[in-house]
A protein has these predicted regions:
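Glycine-rich phosphate/pyrophosphate-binding beta-alpha loops
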Residues: 102, 129-135, 175, 211-212
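Structural signature of FAD isoalloxazine-binding scaffolds in flavoprotein oxidoreductases
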Residues: 36-46, 105-109, 184, 190
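Buried hydrophobic positions in well-ordered alpha/beta secondary-structure cores of metabolic enzymes
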Residues: 22, 29, 45, 75, ...
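A short, Trp-centered hydrophobic/proline-enriched beta-strand micro-motif
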Residues: 89-97
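N-terminal glycine-rich flavin-associated loop
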Residues: 58-77, 103-106, 115
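Glycine-rich beta->alpha junctions and the first turn(s) of the following alpha-helix
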Residues: 51-52, 164-213
Length: 213
């Protein structure tokens, strides 16, 4: 069908339509543009969408692991800037954790961020693998280590920033309509205000979000 044929723009438009129905922001507080439903209600919605195959994968990646890191761990400015767009479906998100050499051992990721001399930006370099919704995401939650830190930190990136590139879509056996990409970061300038939560707390964010998202 059109979804599995990866018709250009179809999946993002379906997420936007779900957003118009309030389904994308079901668990987001009303003051941030969502419906403010409880966890049980969100699960009922997700169960109903579960038969949607490729759409269900894209929907849950966007509403869960892409949106919840900012909703749960973002400061007030970050939430006001990004959550209303994510809750409406006008912005699409992705979660960038896995790397070629770090799958189940996610905290061994090699992506690195270095603070500039003026202290205004982090310069991010690295590669992420098998990123669901990566092909059409506007907002990327990216995990990388700052300098020589032992633990990951988390950052909020925007797709149109210089230095973000990606490979063509992965050729999958199933759920073909759900975008899956490799994403590369080459000297991406990330404003310091886009550090999510606290330095060195990215692994905590990553696993907690996977548990609930």
């Amino acid at each position: 069908d059109a979804i599995d044929d990866m018709q250009e723009g179809l999946m993002p438009s379906l997420i936007e339509e779900a957003g118009e129905l309030g389904l994308v922001g079901a668990s987001v507080p009303e003051e941030l543009g969502g419906m403010g439903l409880d966890f049980k209600s969100s699960m009922i919605i997700t169960e109903g969408i579960g038969g949607g195959h490729s759409f269900a994968v894209s929907y849950t990646a966007h509403t869960g692991i892409a949106t919840l890191p900012i909703l749960y761990y973002g400061n007030e400015e970050q939430k006001k800037k990004y959550i209303p767009g994510l809750a409406s479906g006008k912005l699409k998100g992705c979660y960038c954790l896995t790397e070629p050499s770090s799958g189940s051992d996610a905290n061994s990721a090699k992506s690195r961020a270095t603070l500039t001399n003026d202290g205004k930006h982090y310069i991010l370099n690295g590669q992420k693998m098998w990123i669901t919704t990566g092909g059409f995401a506007d907002i990327l939650v990216v995990f990388a280590k700052i300098d020589d830190d032992e633990n990951l930190s988390a950052f909020i990136l925007e797709k149109d920033w210089d230095g973000i590139t990606m490979n063509p879509e992965e050729k999958k056996m199933g759920i073909k309509g759900s975008s899956t990409r490799q994403i590369f970061f080459n000297d991406v300038k990330v404003p310091v205000e886009n550090l999510l939560y606290e330095r060195g707390k990215g692994f905590k964010i990553a696993v907690n979000i996977l548990n609930v998202g």
